[in-house]
């Protein structure tokens, strides 16, 4: 019966962690391939 606590954990996870991983992976991709 703890489903009401799921969004309060899941929203910051998607809103902060996912963009951080996406930015980090994009940065590493650019550094690896020397696009810039």
From Swiss-Prot:
It is a single-pass membrane protein. GO terms for cellular component: chloroplast thylakoid membrane; photosystem I; plastid. This is Photosystem I reaction center subunit VIII. Keywords: Chloroplast, Membrane, Photosynthesis, Photosystem I, Plastid, Thylakoid, Transmembrane, Transmembrane helix. One of its GO terms (biological process) is photosynthesis. HAMAP family: PSI_PsaI. Belongs to the PsaI family. It is found in: Plastid, Chloroplast thylakoid membrane. InterPro entries: PSI_PsaI, PSI_PsaI_sf. The chain crosses the membrane at residues 10-30. Its main location: plastid. May help in the organization of the PsaL subunit.
